């Protein structure tokens, strides 16, 4: 702790001091609330709503509202919020992150700001890490909200649109980050405003906020349709990279988890694929296939990053060790792994809509979160999300003993020592929770314990209900539980009878995670609410963290000591070195996330423009004005492009202009060419615009005004959707190749921003042109109806750029030879099927 902190207290301590007077006000109301009957307590909700309508703010009524929730909770749930929980509730209401240790009752804390903000009628979203916790919390806390007259909803995967809409219209809605994010994307793909399910994003409380806003931050949610690219390219690229020689043709940067071709590798690629310059922008697609094949073969490890089960490649969650069935790496990485493992390669999908959690959660009016471990990432929360981290004091002091790390020379010696330590604790009945970094390590320790005859359970659950059940019993006497570091998060481990007397729950970490936060979470499973407990990390010089990031000095010290395989050292120097290695990785990961946010912000701004335009089309009764503006823009651009006053053949320029506009919006026979040649540019634009408007008015006479207004909306929505989907794909391709600009001393993010903006402008022009063309050529007998441009086939997490990305969903409704539903009379494959 620095000198200033020692004198003035930490930032959190000073902020908590400021909050304590509000807590005193709540406590002063305790006796008043106790005297109220149930009906009088319930009536407070109506009173608060009236006061808010009359101009008071939620801050004005906070002490009373919190006091009401506290008393209602005591009556309904038999749980009364203590002072530290009130502090946590105030921190959340203020739009900050409350760091609260395991067992401090975060679920109950959330009821305070949820009730207070629910009184506004604008909706409160409480985000949990899985469906099981969402259902559990909504059911338990829903009793409390219901008693006070507020409604509770829960969003889980299997709900219909009607059920989702009802849940979102509740005062307080529980659900997972995935479900909320996908619903946002789907709402921006609907063709009738009545199909939307979400309201405006008002206030959210994110449970396990570090997991969602940091660990999952780079993971985009992707709604996808069926792609058209052949899977053969993946096989060819896979065959090519398997012929490469390490260090000669490619190098691996383990710190960045990247594989790169050397100059020799570039030359080999040019020879194999018969291209002149592999790094050329025109070879961006080839680079994409080769890059993903390199990563699949030399960076992704079977049984660590993914498993092959029944002919399918299944992702292993790097934080929980769970199999993530149904989730696919995006960007073709999953297909590259399928080629590597020689299993059936699924067709690459086409992205229809996508957003990262970083950008989804930044759209809320007020964002808050709670977790047991956030302080180590305080800078990132502040810089990316504008969130403060406030450490809330524990209700009882933490008495858990955190032992120094034990460092072993080899992995084998370390695992033997871990098993011996477990057996010793088991002999006296002390419960043990063993944290591993992978399923593979869990199974190795399990097999060694079996040989020793130590009964144990391995937490490798696919079902969160089962996982929660196992974790609940992990604190009972004699219980040994092996789990990946983050498994069972959100479920308390309560100590069984007689366990306190023998030292409480013993935590054994079998490896340091690259993030200190994950290690702290594992430690925090023990010592809840002032219970005794202890934690120790067992480390070997062969662990990934030590091998890749640890200093050579440490390796030298251990070698000099001449340790036996099962001997360990405890050293402050080693512990400091490990912490420095972790800080290095955390800093590196933060930089990656910041860089990716630079890319993603470009798409985010563009997404906002498109979704805003879509919403206006859906909401608006009349988009005719917008169509006429587009018509003028199309004509103006055409005149600027074709009519150059210094042109050698002025008349020929006009002929090209008239021919171009004839295809879009003005019949040739309507234009007086000789008269045009005598006009200025502005006069030409005005004249052609008048001709086009006259033509459009004739079109209106063929239809009723009401019918044409609907057709305008249909055509505009279709143009926006098809062009936006193509644009997403083009931006993906741009991002794939942009990294090579660094070789030309160009900042890739800056280049992406500039070129992406130019592409966006082109897309907007293309939307205008397409919309105008379709409307000026529409026929009564072929008037288009509202149909989705593409049908969702999948919603998945794509792949983190340079790790796994996020979720995806799919679109395929019409046969390729069916008549296109848009009314053109063409076959689907020759019409909208090209876009879908």
Swiss-Prot record:
<keyword id="KW-0547">Nucleotide-binding</keyword>
<keyword id="KW-1003">Cell membrane</keyword>
<dbReference type="InterPro" id="IPR011116">
    <property type="entry name" value="SecA_Wing/Scaffold"/>
</dbReference>
<dbReference type="InterPro" id="IPR000185">
    <property type="entry name" value="SecA"/>
</dbReference>
<dbReference type="InterPro" id="IPR036670">
    <property type="entry name" value="SecA_X-link_sf"/>
</dbReference>
<comment type="function">
    <text>Part of the Sec protein translocase complex. Interacts with the SecYEG preprotein conducting channel. Has a central role in coupling the hydrolysis of ATP to the transfer of proteins into and across the cell membrane, serving as an ATP-driven molecular motor driving the stepwise translocation of polypeptide chains across the membrane.</text>
</comment>
<keyword id="KW-0472">Membrane</keyword>
<dbReference type="GO" id="GO:0005524">
    <property type="term" value="F:ATP binding"/>
</dbReference>
<keyword id="KW-0811">Translocation</keyword>
<keyword id="KW-0653">Protein transport</keyword>
<keyword id="KW-0479">Metal-binding</keyword>
<dbReference type="GO" id="GO:0065002">
    <property type="term" value="P:intracellular protein transmembrane transport"/>
</dbReference>
<dbReference type="InterPro" id="IPR027417">
    <property type="entry name" value="P-loop_NTPase"/>
</dbReference>
<dbReference type="InterPro" id="IPR014018">
    <property type="entry name" value="SecA_motor_DEAD"/>
</dbReference>
<dbReference type="InterPro" id="IPR004027">
    <property type="entry name" value="SEC_C_motif"/>
</dbReference>
<feature type="binding site">
    <location>
        <begin position="103"/>
        <end position="107"/>
    </location>
    <ligand>
        <name>ATP</name>
    </ligand>
</feature>
<feature type="binding site">
    <location>
        <position position="85"/>
    </location>
    <ligand>
        <name>ATP</name>
    </ligand>
</feature>
<dbReference type="Pfam" id="PF21090">
    <property type="entry name" value="P-loop_SecA"/>
</dbReference>
<dbReference type="GO" id="GO:0031522">
    <property type="term" value="C:cell envelope Sec protein transport complex"/>
</dbReference>
<dbReference type="Pfam" id="PF01043">
    <property type="entry name" value="SecA_PP_bind"/>
</dbReference>
<dbReference type="InterPro" id="IPR011115">
    <property type="entry name" value="SecA_DEAD"/>
</dbReference>
<dbReference type="InterPro" id="IPR014001">
    <property type="entry name" value="Helicase_ATP-bd"/>
</dbReference>
<keyword id="KW-0067">ATP-binding</keyword>
<dbReference type="InterPro" id="IPR011130">
    <property type="entry name" value="SecA_preprotein_X-link_dom"/>
</dbReference>
<comment type="similarity">
    <text>Belongs to the SecA family.</text>
</comment>
<comment type="subunit">
    <text>Monomer and homodimer. Part of the essential Sec protein translocation apparatus which comprises SecA, SecYEG and auxiliary proteins SecDF. Other proteins may also be involved.</text>
</comment>
<keyword id="KW-1278">Translocase</keyword>
<dbReference type="Pfam" id="PF07517">
    <property type="entry name" value="SecA_DEAD"/>
</dbReference>
<protein>
    <recommendedName>
        <fullName>Protein translocase subunit SecA</fullName>
        <ecNumber>7.4.2.8</ecNumber>
    </recommendedName>
</protein>
<feature type="binding site">
    <location>
        <position position="820"/>
    </location>
    <ligand>
        <name>Zn(2+)</name>
    </ligand>
</feature>
<dbReference type="GO" id="GO:0046872">
    <property type="term" value="F:metal ion binding"/>
</dbReference>
<dbReference type="InterPro" id="IPR036266">
    <property type="entry name" value="SecA_Wing/Scaffold_sf"/>
</dbReference>
<dbReference type="Pfam" id="PF07516">
    <property type="entry name" value="SecA_SW"/>
</dbReference>
<keyword id="KW-0862">Zinc</keyword>
<dbReference type="InterPro" id="IPR044722">
    <property type="entry name" value="SecA_SF2_C"/>
</dbReference>
<feature type="binding site">
    <location>
        <position position="822"/>
    </location>
    <ligand>
        <name>Zn(2+)</name>
    </ligand>
</feature>
<dbReference type="GO" id="GO:0043952">
    <property type="term" value="P:protein transport by the Sec complex"/>
</dbReference>
<feature type="binding site">
    <location>
        <position position="831"/>
    </location>
    <ligand>
        <name>Zn(2+)</name>
    </ligand>
</feature>
<dbReference type="InterPro" id="IPR001650">
    <property type="entry name" value="Helicase_C-like"/>
</dbReference>
<dbReference type="Pfam" id="PF02810">
    <property type="entry name" value="SEC-C"/>
</dbReference>
<feature type="binding site">
    <location>
        <position position="492"/>
    </location>
    <ligand>
        <name>ATP</name>
    </ligand>
</feature>
<dbReference type="InterPro" id="IPR020937">
    <property type="entry name" value="SecA_CS"/>
</dbReference>
